[in-house]
Structures are given as structure tokens and as C-alpha cells.
């Protein structure tokens, strides 16, 4: 059976709330950044539900021995935010995966061609076998940036089945590209918006998430 891209839009009231705050053009940068951090937290929570491997063990309570299920300490976890806007999602995600290593990836989009160029690559030469990777990109618009990021990850022996992509807003254009190129991928997003404008921005979207986070 052929693989098929899995896209989840969690029906969580806190995700809906913080998305509404982030969408509002009157939200000041400090609150916008807070909203993005909360979206990073709750979308990571949803993404981790069937993704975190556990081991069965026993612990001693003050009264007796109890069975317990703990996150497998042998599994390597990695968070990769795509700069700049991906930084806003890191705090929330890292709060749930405190032992994860964080590797930064900087990609900037040419506003004329809409093609990305790489300006920062802190990825390792290779990822350890079995690495679980959380990829953070707030806006999946044309799909060009996320495709470039995935090319860099795949060249370093990451297993697409072990990637969870967290995005705040996604457009059908990007999802179609990802479906064609990486059907094993799993995506968690707060919303799938209808379309892109002639500048490649998602509509209604959030505007420029990086600019809004940092007040520039």
C-alpha cells in the first residue's frame, strides 16, 4: 500500500484560542510571540501523543511498588526550528521535550522568486539511527522552504516516519508538494487556510510571522 501524507488539525480549544490571538493584526509583538509559544506547546503535545516511545518499568512510591511507563531514555530526540519564525515555537516545544537537542536551520525566502536560500545550517553531519525529529515551521505557504529543509534532513539519514512537522498555518499548495515528495510525513497544524496571494503569503494567515514576533 502506498504511503499517504498525514495532516492533523487538532480540535483543542487552547489551540483555537491562541491561533485567534496570533491572527489578530492588533496583537502586539510580545503577545504574538506568547501566542506562538503556546501554539508550539499545544501542537507539540498533540504531535507527541503516538510518537514518543515508552518503556515499562516499576517505581517505588512511599507506600508500595507501582508499575510505570516512562519515555525511553535511549531514544534520541531533536528539535529543528526553521529561522526566524520557527524560534517562536521552540520554547513551547522544548518545555515538553526538555532533553531534546536543538539544531537551528536558517532559510530566507526571496520575495520575488519565492525560492529559499540557506544562510545558517547547524545540523549534524548525520543523525543517529532512530532519531525522533520535531520540525518547526510556523507557515507552510508555497512549500519551497520546508522542502529545502527536508532535503537537508534526508541527506543526513533521518527517517521521514520519525519526523513530526509542527506548523501554525498551512496552505494546500505546500501540503500538495509535501504529499508528492514526502508521503511518509506527519504534520500537525492549527489551521489549513484557503489560498496564497500573489506574494506567496497565506490568506487569511498571520502575515509575516517573523516580523510580527520581533516587531520588525
From Swiss-Prot:
Its cofactor is Mg(2+). Pathway: Pyrimidine metabolism; UMP biosynthesis via salvage pathway; UMP from uracil: step 1/1. It comes from the Bacteria. Uracil binds at residues 202, 207-209. It comes from Synechocystis sp. (strain ATCC 27184 / PCC 6803 / Kazusa). Catalyzes the conversion of uracil and 5-phospho-alpha-D-ribose 1-diphosphate (PRPP) to UMP and diphosphate. One of its GO terms (cellular component) is cytoplasm. It catalyses: UMP + diphosphate = 5-phospho-alpha-D-ribose 1-diphosphate + uracil. Allosterically activated by GTP. Keywords: Allosteric enzyme, Glycosyltransferase, GTP-binding, Magnesium, Nucleotide-binding, Transferase. 5-phospho-alpha-D-ribose 1-diphosphate binds at residues 84, 109, 137-145, 208. Pfam families: UPRTase (PF14681). NCBIfam families: PRK00129.1 (NF001097), upp (TIGR01091). GO terms for molecular function: GTP binding; magnesium ion binding; uracil phosphoribosyltransferase activity. This is Uracil phosphoribosyltransferase. Binds 1 Mg(2+) ion per subunit. The magnesium is bound as Mg-PRPP. GO terms for biological process: UMP salvage; uracil salvage. The gene is upp. Belongs to the UPRTase family. Its EC number is 2.4.2.9.
